[in-house]
């Protein structure tokens, strides 16, 4: 039986979710129970007990706390989500608390998936996950991604 990880919520139901750092084996089981088969970890250190659920593939994109992702990290994240979703598999993404780095990646994915302008994607993520995208540099990363992809 799984236990909901802190700050878990769907951004695209059944396809893409954000969460804080999973700390218990039961957090990973919760993700598996919901169909999440890929976990993108944005922390510099890997999440504890990540080997407790062999059905969950861990993808590491190390980003320092309060920093924006690099363009190649955003591109890799989008690729992971697209490939997993094409197979009917959901993706979870986490940083430490699930706000800054996580929110930035989620907003970039909304730019790509829904064709939203950067400001609209940021506003939507903040509506769904209040407190997300914590720094000017993280906001700027979403705007730069939008400029690169429009």
From Swiss-Prot:
It is found in: Cytoplasm, Cytosol; Nucleus. Widely expressed. Highly expressed in spleen, prostate, colon, adrenal gland, mammary gland, thyroid and trachea. Expressed at lower level in uterus, small intestine, bladder, bone marrow, brain, spinal cord and stomach. It holds the Pfam family PTP-SAK. GO terms for cellular component: cytoplasm; cytosol; nucleoplasm. InterPro entries: Prot-tyrosine_phosphatase-like, PTP, PTP-SAK, Tyr_Pase_AS, Tyr_Pase_cat, Tyr_Pase_dom, TYR_PHOSPHATASE_DUAL_dom. GO terms for molecular function: phosphatase activity; protein serine/threonine phosphatase activity; protein tyrosine phosphatase activity; protein tyrosine/serine/threonine phosphatase activity. Residues 7-150 form the Tyrosine-protein phosphatase domain. GO terms for biological process: cilium assembly; dephosphorylation. Keywords: Cytoplasm, Hydrolase, Nucleus, Protein phosphatase. It comes from the Eukaryota. Belongs to the protein-tyrosine phosphatase family. Non-receptor class dual specificity subfamily. PANTHER family: TYROSINE SPECIFIC PROTEIN PHOSPHATASE AND DUAL SPECIFICITY PROTEIN PHOSPHATASE. Protein phosphatase that mediates dephosphorylation of proteins phosphorylated on Tyr and Ser/Thr residues. In vitro, it can dephosphorylate p44-ERK1 (MAPK3) but not p54 SAPK-beta (MAPK10) in vitro. Able to enhance activation of JNK and p38 (MAPK14). This is Dual specificity protein phosphatase 23. It comes from Homo sapiens (Human).
């Amino acid at each position: 039986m799984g236990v909901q990880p802190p700050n878990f919520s769907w951004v695209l139901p059944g396809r893409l979710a954000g969460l804080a750092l999973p700390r218990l084996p039961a957090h990973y089981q919760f993700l598996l129970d919901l169909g999440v088969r890929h976990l993108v970890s944005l922390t510099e250190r890997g999440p504890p007990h990540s080997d407790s659920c062999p059905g969950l593939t861990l993808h590491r994109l190390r980003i320092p706390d309060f920093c924006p992702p690099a363009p190649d990290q955003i591109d890799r994240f989008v690729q992971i989500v697209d490939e997993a979703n094409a197979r009917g598999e959901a993706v979870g993404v986490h940083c430490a608390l699930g706000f800054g780095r996580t929110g930035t990646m989620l907003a970039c994915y909304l730019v790509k998936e829904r064709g939203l302008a950067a400001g609209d994607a940021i506003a939507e993520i903040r509506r769904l996950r209040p407190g997300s995208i914590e720094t000017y540099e993280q906001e700027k990363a979403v705007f730069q991604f939008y400029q690169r992809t429009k």
